[in-house]
Amino acid sequence: MSDESHPHERHMTPRKLFYLALGSVGVVYGDIGTSPLYAFREALKPVAHDGVTRFEVISLISLMIWALTIIVTIKYVLFLLRADNDGEGGTLSLLALLMKTANGHTALLMLLGLMGAALFLGDAMITPALSVLSAVEGLKLVTPSLAEYIVPISVVILALLFVVQSRGTGAVAKFFGPITAVWFLVMAAAGISHISDDFGILAAFNPYYAVSFLLHEGFYGVVVLGAVFLTVTGAEALYADLGHFGRRPIQWAWFLLVFPALTLNYLGQGALVLGKPETMSDPFYLMYPQWALLPVVILATAATIIASQAVITGAFSLVRQGINLGFLPRMEILFTSETNTGQIFLPSVNAVLFFGVIFLVLSFKTSDALATAYGISVTGAMVVTSIMAFEFVRARWNWSLPVAVIALAPLVVLEMIFLGANLLKIHDGGYIPILIATAFTVVMWTWRRGTAILMEKTRHTDIPLASFVSSIERKSEHSPAQVPGTAIFLTSDPESAPAALLHNLKHNHVLHDRNVILTIRTVNKPRVPSHDRYKVEPISERFSRVELLFGFMESQNVSQALATLRKTGLKFDIMSTSFYLGRRKLVPDAKSGMPYWQDRLYIALANAAANPSDYFRLPANRVVELGSHVII
């Protein structure tokens, strides 16, 4: 993103910059802000088998600080935030941009993008479960007798979180930033208060300790990397939420608040363990005096709920992008705000996430156990993003191959090492995110492939629209009766006569005064300006071809978009217009090009898809559906 390409950033007032930066603290940094609850604790475990040494503690903190510096600061904050698609970030946004310039390896790029999106959806299940569990576990330090109630309390909190999604969070979202900012300030204060326990912890800024530890610890060093990576979980949110806040507010929030607070807190935890080794069982909560524990647990729970909310909202947005880009079937999308079309609720996605999150909490029961499963989905998503970023700088910024390799290969290698370290935890629950991501990838790939096969098969039997119109406009005794009004026929192929039009002629023997062949197309950019929304092409006296263009971040409100067509002279009353939709009954074919099980999956997805009249927000009492059988 450049300031020139986004005038609202170039002319942003200091006041607006402050409020956007504050808002980004709650949404963008909520996930990474909950990592101190468990990251250092988990990193200590692999080396605690024979007691931790001073060198090991300083080295672990050094690894965490430099992971935050290299992966979050350099890769995401300074580099990836500039690799935008008209201001939007995220895996599918980057994929949509690359699809415009892909040369010969479109399928590989698509598969990578789908894997990245699937890993993010897996992360959307694990993050709420792990974050809330880790916060509520602080209760056992307040009152040990509450230990047995941690799982039930976590389940209740998470259940309430998913229940309120349908009502929207607009009313309380304005508090997310301030609450999370207080959380970061409290963490920073706790860190500062304990650095004096052992000023030797400041040596962690020296990368010598991080490198030396990895070189000397061997296998344990690799295992530790899996836990160290927990410090950077949530970094993908920086890129995914780029379009909501803009580059500068996200960068300012990182450098002025988030990065310093995280660094100070990790230094404080390290100094505490150096001074009091017995605190390594839970260094985060043991930084606070007994009287402050309950307020900190409450604040931590609020912060984890906000982090979970941000991930859930991100999942809704990602799925809508997937639907609009043709990677997922249409789903019911409800708008929870009358003024902000970005505030959406997808009941089916909410249900899948809810059951997945509750299953994880009941299965793993502790944040210790769940943390082992967490890193794989995040490291996988980061590796995918880095590979796609390599393609981006080559295709969009015209970097030469040597420059791109020199700049990005070290990042990819580092993240591959982190991924390898996390893969060591497959038997301890690491298989869970792999299974989740595989399932989502198969669903998206099946939908994309099945839709392409279906279009190819129907194209062989379709009648070219130009030929059809030419024949129907010739007057003869067999011409259909003409009736007043306008008929709009929705079709995915503007070059062929819609099946609904042919069936209407076959069964009703009528043709309207005005007939519009309407195609809805999603372009590979986030939004389409209103003056570029439509393309109108007269075919004959009674037929017109109209194409409505939407960005992948937009709601496809066809009724509203058609109202703008009046500017072209194509006048009609939406409430006296009939919309004709084709409904296909799909039948599996052994020679479809996909395995039988994939045929069945595609048909199941098609049957479960939202009704197009609801999805495109057409007036229900003006819609006519005509069915047909199609063998896929």
From Swiss-Prot:
The chain crosses the membrane at residues 17-37, 60-80, 106-126, 144-164, 175-195, 210-230, 254-274, 292-312, 344-364, 370-390, 401-421, 426-446. It is a multi-pass membrane protein. The keyword Repressor does not apply. It catalyses: K(+)(in) + H(+)(in) = K(+)(out) + H(+)(out). It is found in: Cell inner membrane. Keywords: Cell inner membrane, Cell membrane, Ion transport, Membrane, Potassium, Potassium transport, Symport, Transmembrane, Transmembrane helix, Transport. Pfam families: K_trans (PF02705), K_trans_C (PF22776). It comes from the Bacteria. HAMAP family: Kup (MF_01522). Transport of potassium into the cell. Likely operates as a K(+):H(+) symporter. This is Probable potassium transport system protein Kup 1. It comes from Rhizobium etli (strain ATCC 51251 / DSM 11541 / JCM 21823 / NBRC 15573 / CFN 42). The gene is kup1.
